[in-house]
UniProtKB/Swiss-Prot annotation:
Disulfide bonds join 315-327. Sequence repeats lie at residues 205-206, 207-208, 209-210, 211-212. The extracellular loops are most variable in sequence, and in some bacteria confer sensitivity to phage and/or colicins. It comes from the Bacteria. This is Outer membrane protein A. Residues 205-212 are annotated as: 4 X 2 AA tandem repeats of A-P. Gene3D superfamilies: 2.40.160.20, OmpA-like domain. Its main location: membrane. Monomer and homodimer.
Length: 350
């Protein structure tokens, strides 16, 4: 009884500290153990010689980890063959069994746990006896006994763990059947492999798409290419020039931007006349670009009259009308300002 109490105390000592190196939740593990098996209370009926109580023990086990604190194990234990010798009787006793236990653990550090196992073992015990005169008898017995164990477990890697454990099993056998009813203490070192411990690859959020780039471009077209002198109707050559311009505007995606068409005249004529002519010419360009596909709410016309001449005073001394008209040709122009959105395309990383 005293030895049983000590074994239980060792098993429950695992809960006096803090810790965990248990496998991940809801995963399986399997392992093996090897150690020192010692039988207790081994008095054989009619035995008159020494009994070799210390033997080699071994086992294999598998388990399921529910969470960091609770798991279940099933295992096979070979508790060793214990010979005894005497003047009148000699023989051997051996025991083995299958156990099922609940494993209760508590983490001390990230890599180290203490634990206890509580459950039962279905065992088989066999004896062989030789008596004077050469007679030999063999007997066996089966039964169920409680199992108590306590130990520490250290995770070498997430998959590989080692354990040091002391296990106690009560009353393995029936003295009336096989001549003895020993207890067993097994001090063992074990190693286990844990399945499903690999960390899932981190999900890398895709980089946000770069903000669309707003571009502003200016185009200047000579009015003499677009219109006849003093007229606001587009010439065929002017339509061709606007067709080429439209292909460039499309690349800027004016649907997401705006287009402003500015009409300019030279200084020949009155201010009012030139203002009206510049407005008509700008509107003619707008109407044509709308017909090509630019939304009407994204484009506007503005007449600038004879303001902002580009010739400056270079034509001040030119007197003949025809020569003056030629000299002032750069002032007769249509300027187009486009603000458009262009998507920024990033190349994927290799």
């Amino acid at each position: 009884m005293k030895k049983t109490a000590i074994a239980i105390a060792v098993a429950l000592a695992g809960f006096a500290t803090v810790a965990q190196a248990a496998p991940k939740d809801n995963t399986w593990y399997a392992g093996a153990k090897l150690g020192w098996s010692q039988y207790h209370d081994t008095g054989f009926i009619h035995n008159d010689g020494p009994t070799h109580e210390n033997q080699l023990g071994a086992g294999a086990f598998g388990g399921y980890q529910v969470n960091p604190y609770v798991g279940f194990e099933m295992g096979y234990d070979w508790l060793g063959r214990m010979p005894y010798k005497g003047d009148n009787t000699n023989g051997a006793y051996k025991a083995q069994g299958v156990q099922l236990t609940a494993k209760l653990g508590y983490p001390i550090t990230d890599d180290l746990d203490v634990y206890t196992r509580l459950g039962g073992m279905v065992w088989r015990a066999d004896t062989k006896s030789n008596v004077p005169g050469g007679a030999s008898t063999k007997d066996h017995d089966t039964g169920v006994s409680p199992v108590f164990a306590g130990g520490i477990e250290y995770a070498i890697t997430p998959e590989i763990a080692t354990r040091l454990e002391y296990q106690w099993t009560n009353n393995i056998g029936d003295a009336n059947t096989i001549g003895t009813r020993p207890d067993n203490g097994l001090l063992s070192v074990g190693v286990s492999y844990r399945f499903g411990q690999q960390e899932a690859a981190p999900v890398v959020a895709p980089a946000p798409a770069p903000a669309p780039e707003v571009q502003t471009k200016h185009f200047t077209l000579k009015s003499d290419v677009l219109f006849n002198f003093n007229k606001s109707t587009l010439k065929p050559e002017g339509q061709q020039a606007l067709d080429q311009l439209y292909s460039q505007l499309s690349n800027l995606d004016p649907k997401d931007g705006s287009v402003v068409v500015l009409g300019f005249t030279d200084r020949i004529g009155s201010d009012a006349y030139n203002q009206g002519l510049s407005e008509k010419r700008a509107q003619s360009v707008v109407d044509y670009l709308i017909s090509k596909g630019i939304p009407s709410d994204k484009i506007s016309a503005r007449g600038m009259g004879e303001s902002n001449p580009v010739t400056g005073n270079t034509c001040d001394n030119v007197k003949p009308r025809a020569a003056l008209i030629d000299c002032l040709a750069p002032d007769r122009r249509v300027e187009i300002e486009v603000k458009g959105v262009k998507d920024v395309v990033t190349q994927p990383q290799a």
